[in-house]
């Protein structure tokens, strides 16, 4: 039984945002918070996978950021990381607060959609 879960945080950002800045900011904050603990979790995960018939997957050792198109209005900026289930909510809340604080500090680089449909 695998003792961790993959968790995600998603923000909607405008197409005109500085996507490199958004990705770097989200990744850096997640790495600062999770650090070596995530590396250990990934090692455990890959060891467990090696004992299964599942083909070798590429498992990232650090938090990763991906972007997805969300309709015609904005992009989803998503950071993925590995966490213990009991800590998931607390860590997610802490990460969201820190990410929003840093992203909001650069309003010319991080443009959030100006709509009530968020």
Q: Which functions belong to the PLM regions below?
A:
Residues 1-118:
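Structured, soluble regulatory/oligomerization domains located on the cytosolic or IMS-facing side
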């Amino acid at each position: 039984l695998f003792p961790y879960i993959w968790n995600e945080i998603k923000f909607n950002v405008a197409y005109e945002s500085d996507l490199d800045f958004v990705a770097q900011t989200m990744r850096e904050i997640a790495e600062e918070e999770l650090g070596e603990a995530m590396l250990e979790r990934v090692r455990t995960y890959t060891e467990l996978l090696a004992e299964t018939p599942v083909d070798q997957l590429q498992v990232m050792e650090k938090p990763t950021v991906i972007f997805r198109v969300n309709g015609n209005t904005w992009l989803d900026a998503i950071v993925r990381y590995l966490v213990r289930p009991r800590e998931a909510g607390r860590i997610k809340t802490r990460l969201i607060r820190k990410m929003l604080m840093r992203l909001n500090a650069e309003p010319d680089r991080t443009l959030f959609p100006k709509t009530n449909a968020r």
